[in-house]
Swiss-Prot record:
It catalyses: Couples ATP hydrolysis with the unwinding of duplex DNA at the replication fork by translocating in the 5'-3' direction. This creates two antiparallel DNA single strands (ssDNA). The leading ssDNA polymer is the template for DNA polymerase III holoenzyme which synthesizes a continuous strand; ATP + H2O = ADP + phosphate + H(+). This is ATP-dependent DNA helicase Pif1. Coiled coil: none annotated. Belongs to the helicase family. PIF1 subfamily. Monomer. InterPro entries: AAA+_ATPase (IPR003593), DNA_helicase_pif1-like_DEAD (IPR010285), Helicase_HTH (IPR029491), P-loop_NTPase (IPR027417), PIF1_helicase (IPR051055). The keyword Protein biosynthesis does not apply. GO terms for biological process: DNA recombination; DNA repair; telomere maintenance. Its cofactor is Mg(2+). PANTHER family: ATP-DEPENDENT DNA HELICASE. Keywords: ATP-binding, DNA damage, DNA recombination, DNA repair, DNA-binding, Helicase, Hydrolase, Isomerase, Nucleotide-binding.
């Protein structure tokens, strides 16, 4: 099926499963549909089964969006507790279209839970509470990790009751858009060819196997990612590479509390070490989602140093690009951090997370170029009443010169060294190879008899999906264009959207202008990078230049490759330095300002020391009295006072404008 046909089906409001081989344009088609909905003001939620896939969609995980977390069952009491979360309830009730990307990695039980929660929250017994659900993915990817003894039949989402109830229309995309052609020694054999042969029913040709084997002799990028089937190989390589580094070493000892068996279960799910040793120069990967920090489970980078900042600042502080000297030492970063006068505004999270047993924390330069500080994260197990039964706290990083194939799902790699000689699960080889853009980026160390084989259940389902997609295509081709257009319009109206041409045109114009501005900002960012030094005042000036162009917080953050909360911190400092600074375009609604101001006054009046950060030179140098207290006030008490109805970033921004 072509993308245009799939979009026509999506616009009717039918529940849809969008699938196809790697590079067939699933994500592109989803983004086109999301753009169509937003132009018509139809409330759409973009989610994915994993953190790294969610970042590709500029969304969040389905687990977080729906409130199911990591559970695989929900009691009536659980549902009642979820209903009490106003933000969650409002979100689920207001959504008209739910998109779930990488559906292959969502367990059947969890799809059932999403269905259960939506029915409960929306008080609607129709599948998924009556909203349109669009799931996308490729079931030739590895299935989600399940309980011991579970078969793939138990795990695949298409085997769930929710899937059957939804009655998904199948859109199987057949065009190729990612894999590059004309590669390798034999121009007739491309990675696209090989992947399609693996998916096909006739097996992989001798020429394709030879093309793969010939990559053993290729020299690929020295910064390549290494993919292995087993953790033992991954650990061996990572430990070897770590030993070669001569940089500063810090070891983090995890902290565990509660029931021993539950703690062990947490450790297995976290997949990190009780004793985590890191060095400057290490390749690392985050192992827990942190939307406020801007990282996902699977985000990769390089450890460029360690810092000894206060715990509150550390968990969430983001460091400006270029704040380290060329050798990546931490001293320049420490100096830059110490100059920050408004640590609270730079905080990415005010949850007072527990600390692991050290006072030095990793500074990671992400592959995107942004730099962040990683603080200890806590994983917990709760009972039905919310009481914590077990907890495990560790720095959410793992060494990442090598990673398992399972962990690589959702990534797109320019170069990789892959060892399939110990393949033990059907589909591992396909997943590993489909991470790459071309054969030119592949160095294959070995294969075995399982490496190029796929799960029979997935293969059978895929064949059925193709047949159902053809049926859907033929059915829609018989519908007259005018009738189809009327169907599209009915769904928009039923979803609370608009057909007003002027409004749609205004959205499209704004969208084009935003794209144009983004291109200009990228050019401006490059110019600033060449002009500005690595000092704090220079990075403030870079933000000010963009601010004076009336760009939004999000636009400035994207342009500079920084977190939005970091930019808010810059705005706060700039406004204190120059109260006449023109940033009124960022000013929140008066109703929000009044609510935040009232909360601040109440918290200051209560005078609970736990609601304030410890004083330091930077805060004392600003003002005294109530203004001094306002500078030190934590975000969490404000958030709680407002009953979680105003998000952290809006509170941060409001504080800038409260006198």
């Amino acid at each position: 099926m072509k993308q245009a046909t799939a979009l026509d089906i999506l616009k009717t409001g039918k529940n849809v499963f969008l699938t196809g081989s790697a590079g067939s344009g699933k994500t592109y088609t989803l983004n086109e549909y999301i753009h169509y909905l937003r132009a018509r003001r139809v409330p759409v939620a973009t989610t994915a089964s994993t953190g790294i896939a969610a970042t590709h969609m500029n969304g969040i995980t389905i687990h977080s969006w729906s409130g199911i977390g990591i559970k695989d069952e929900l009691t009536e009491r659980d549902l009642v507790n979820l209903s009490r979360k106003k933000v969650l309830k409002d979100r689920l009730q207001e959504t008209a279209v739910l998109i779930i990307d990488e559906i292959s990695m969502l367990h059947a039980k969890q799809l059932n839970l999403v269905n259960q929660v939506l029915k409960h929250m929306r008080q609607n017994d129709k599948p998924f509470g009556g909203i349109q659900v669009v799931v996308a993915g490729d079931f030739f990817q590895l299935p989600p990790v399940g309980s011991r003894g579970e078969s793939n039949r138990d795990k695949f989402a298409f085997m769930s009751q929710a899937w059957l109830d939804a009655g998904f229309k199948i859109c199987y995309l057949s065009e190729q858009h990612r894999q590059q052609s004309g590669e390798g020694e034999d121009a007739q054999i491309t990675l696209d060819n090989i992947l399609n042969q693996i998916r096909g029913e006739n097996g992989v040709s001798a020429a394709a196997i030879a093309a793969l084997q010939n990559t053993f002799y290729q020299d690929v990028d020295v910064n390549r990612t290494r993919l292995y089937t087993h953790n033992v190989n991954v650990n061996k390589i990572n430990e070897h590479e770590l030993a070669l580094l001569e940089g500063e070493t810090v070891t983090y000892n995890a902290i565990a509390h509660g029931d021993n068996k539950l703690v062990e279960t947490l450790k297995k799910s976290v997949r990190t070490s009780d004793e985590l040793t890191l060095k400057t120069g290490a390749k690392v990967m985050f192992i827990k989602n942190n939307s406020e920090l801007g990282v996902s489970n699977g985000t990769m980078g390089e450890l460029i140093g360690f810092t000894t900042i206060k715990p509150l600042k550390l968990s969430i502080a983001t460091i400006d690009d270029g704040s380290a000297d060329e050798d990546g030492s931490a001293e320049a970063l420490d100096e830059a951090l110490e100059t920050l006068e408004d640590a609270e505004a730079l905080a990415q999270n005010e949850s007072d997370k527990p600390l692991v047993s050290t006072d030095r924390y990793p500074i990671v330069r992400l592959n995107s170029g942004r730099q962040v500080i990683a603080e200890g994260e806590e994983w917990i197990v709760e009972d039905e009443s919310g009481e914590i039964l077990a907890s495990y706290t560790q720095i959410p990083l793992t060494l990442a010169w090598a990673i398992t194939i399972h962990k690589s799902q959702g990534m797109t790699l320019d170069a990789a060294e892959i060892d399939l000689s110990k393949t033990f699960e059907l589909g591992q080889g396909y997943v590993a190879l489909s991470r790459l853009k071309s054969l030119e980026g592949l160095k294959l160390l070995g294969m075995n008899d399982l490496s190029l084989r796929l799960d029979p259940l997935a293969r059978g389902a895929d064949s059925r999906f193709k047949d159902l997609s053809l049926e859907a295509q033929q059915a829609f081709e018989d519908i007259e264009r005018e009738v189809l257009q009327e169907s599209h319009e009915r769904f928009v109206i039923a979803s609370g959207g608009t057909l007003n041409k002027a409004n749609i045109a205004a959205f499209e114009k704004e969208y084009k202008n935003r794209k144009k501005k983004q291109a200009q900002k990228l050019a401006q960012k490059d110019k600033l990078s060449n002009q500005l030094s690595d000092h704090s005042e220079s990075t403030l000036m870079a933000t000010r230049i963009l601010l004076e162009e009336s760009l939004s917080i999000a636009e400035i953050a994207q342009s500079r490759g920084l977190a939005q909360s970091t930019i808010m911190g810059h705005v706060a400092r700039l406004r204190r330095q120059d109260p006449s600074l023109n940033c009124e375009h960022l000013r929140p609604d008066e109703a929000i300002l009044n609510k935040v101001s009232k909360a601040v006054d109440a918290i200051i009046a209560a005078g609970d020391p736990n609601d304030f950060n410890a004083a330091d030179d930077s805060t004392q140098s600003v003002k005294g009295g109530d203004d001094f207290d306002k500078q030190r006030i934590k975000l969490r008490p404000i958030y709680e006072y407002l009953k979680q109805q105003i998000d952290y970033n809006t509170i941060r921004l409001a504080l800038v404008f409260i006198d």
